[in-house]
């Protein structure tokens, strides 16, 4: 039986992880849950799952949760702050960490799980975007097992030889006859919208993704295709891929989740309904297969597959991310920080939809791109880029 800590338990990935665990109670035990500020949702989860520990990033939320648990006579121990999140990721009594905290906030607790030698189910793409080679090196140094959860990276993972699956970040694609990884994306809700109309897109329009059910931040990232840009960076590190070995292609139906092209002309694709419980179940049970609670794919109802090259004039954030990926670790760290601030400002109606890419580019051009040597320098640059982004937003808001 796998014993789990779920980082980001109250979010979309956390909910899907718990759904898979509920589908297979004989295989998974939830030992610890962690979240940010939603103490009421965490109370509900504690009532259902009765974890030994619950960690809240917000000190105030941790206090609220303690009061609520005592009131409902639930014995779950409450931990608080970054230290609490890191503690539940490194518990002796767990072997698996679902790393699903959105954004830079997930880096430290995910790295705590790595340093404790856990099996890391990586849904927090920002951890690799921010720390890249440091993260891969830490997995090797501490004996952590890294399994991708993002639907695209999990799809690629499933199409790769077993030797590569066991050596995430340290493989040689050329050695195994792999010529290219094809990273698919739906193109978001505005792939056919007139480019001139994108400036008037509202937050409500941006979070209405046509295929996937996701949180607001990731939905906006999907609309700008920054999400695909971050996934591109993550794929570069997970699969040790060169620029020539990675290609983004738009596939509006979201049925083929990604593909791997081999030297002999073969292309392996992973397909399924757009439901995160499938890649989550794959990572949770690897190398076995379990019931994910997802309906099987009915090919007679799909109709057709469509593939399009990305239009960078429509998706400038995607181009920024691809370029930053090979400009060095500092560039991707700064871009991720700027994008988090810009998306939050857009969701708060402080800036327009097309301003997100403008702010991201300005940060890439103005942040101090010194060499990052450790996590402290990563976090320092992350904070610097956020301050710069806030200052730019104040001027345009």
Swiss-Prot record:
SUPFAM superfamilies: 1-deoxy-D-xylulose-5-phosphate reductoisomerase, C-terminal domain, Glyceraldehyde-3-phosphate dehydrogenase-like, C-terminal domain, NAD(P)-binding Rossmann-fold domains
Domain of life: Bacteria
UniProt-recorded Gene Ontology molecular function terms: 1-deoxy-D-xylulose-5-phosphate reductoisomerase activity; manganese ion binding; NADPH binding
Residues the entry annotates as binding 1-deoxy-D-xylulose 5-phosphate: 125, 151-152, 186, 209, 222, 227-228, 231
GO-annotated biological processes: isopentenyl diphosphate biosynthetic process, methylerythritol 4-phosphate pathway involved in terpenoid biosynthetic process
Annotated pathway: Isoprenoid biosynthesis; isopentenyl diphosphate biosynthesis via DXP pathway; isopentenyl diphosphate from 1-deoxy-D-xylulose 5-phosphate: step 1/6
Catalysed reactions, semicolon-separated: 2-C-methyl-D-erythritol 4-phosphate + NADP(+) = 1-deoxy-D-xylulose 5-phosphate + NADPH + H(+)
Gene3D superfamilies given in the database record: 1.10.1740.10, NAD(P)-binding Rossmann-like Domain (3.40.50.720)
Keywords tagged on the record: Isoprene biosynthesis, Manganese, Metal-binding, NADP, Oxidoreductase
Enzyme Commission number(s) from the entry: 1.1.1.267
InterPro entries xrefs: DXP_reductoisomerase, DXP_reductoisomerase_C, DXP_reductoisomerase_N, DXPR_C, DXPR_C_sf, NAD(P)-bd_dom_sf
Broadest EC class assigned to this enzyme: oxidoreductase
Entry keyword annotation includes Metal-binding: yes
Purpose of the protein: Catalyzes the NADPH-dependent rearrangement and reduction of 1-deoxy-D-xylulose-5-phosphate (DXP) to 2-C-methyl-D-erythritol 4-phosphate (MEP).
Protein's name according to its UniProt entry: 1-deoxy-D-xylulose 5-phosphate reductoisomerase
Organism: Photobacterium profundum (strain SS9)
Higher taxonomy: Bacteria, Pseudomonadati, Pseudomonadota, Gammaproteobacteria, Vibrionales
């Amino acid at each position: 039986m796998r014993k789990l800590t779920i980082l980001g338990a109250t979010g979309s990935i956390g909910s899907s992880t718990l759904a898979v665990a509920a589908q297979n109670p004989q295989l998974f035990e939830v030992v610890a849950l962690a979240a940010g500020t939603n103490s009421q949702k965490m109370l509900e989860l504690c009532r259902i799952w009765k974890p030994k520990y619950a960690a809240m990033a917000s000190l105030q939320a941790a206090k609220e949760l303690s009061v609520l648990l005592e009131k409902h006579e639930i014995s779950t121990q409450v931990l608080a702050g970054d230290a609490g999140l890191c503690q539940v990721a490194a518990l002796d009594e767990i072997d698996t960490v679902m790393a699903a905290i959105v954004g830079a906030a997930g880096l430290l607790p995910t790295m705590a799980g790595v340093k404790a030698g856990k099996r890391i189910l990586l849904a927090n793409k920002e951890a690799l975007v921010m720390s890249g080679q440091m993260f891969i090196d830490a997995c090797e140094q501490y004996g952590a097992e890294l399994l991708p959860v993002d639907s695209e990276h999990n799809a690629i993972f499933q199409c790769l030889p077993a030797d590569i699956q066991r050596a995430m970040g340290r493989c040689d694609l050329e050695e195994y006859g792999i010529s290219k990884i094809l990273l698919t994306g739906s193109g978001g809700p505005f792939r056919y919208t007139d480019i001139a109309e994108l400036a008037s897109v509202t937050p409500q329009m941006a979070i209405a993704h046509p295929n996937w059910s996701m949180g607001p931040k990731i939905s906006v990232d999907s609309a700008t295709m920054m999400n695909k840009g971050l996934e591109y960076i993550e794929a570069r590190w997970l699969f040790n891929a060169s620029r020539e070995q990675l290609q983004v292609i738009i596939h509006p139906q979201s049925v083929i989740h990604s593909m791997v092209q081999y030297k002999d002309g073969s292309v392996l694709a992973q397909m399924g309904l757009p439901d995160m419980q499938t890649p989550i179940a794959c990572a949770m049970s690897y190398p076995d297969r379990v019931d994910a609670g997802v309906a099987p794919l009915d090919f007679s109802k799909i109709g057709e597959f469509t593939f399009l090259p990305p239009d960078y004039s429509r998706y400038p954030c995607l181009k920024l991310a691809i370029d930053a990926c090979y400009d060095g670790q500092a560039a991707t760290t700064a871009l991720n920080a700027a994008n988090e601030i810009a998306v939050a400002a857009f969701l708060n109606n402080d800036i327009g939809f097309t301003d997100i890419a403008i702010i991201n580019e300005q940060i890439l051009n103005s942040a101090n791109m010194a060499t990052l040597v450790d996590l402290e320098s990563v976090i320092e640059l992350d904070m610097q880029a956020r301050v710069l982004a806030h200052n730019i937003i104040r001027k345009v808001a």
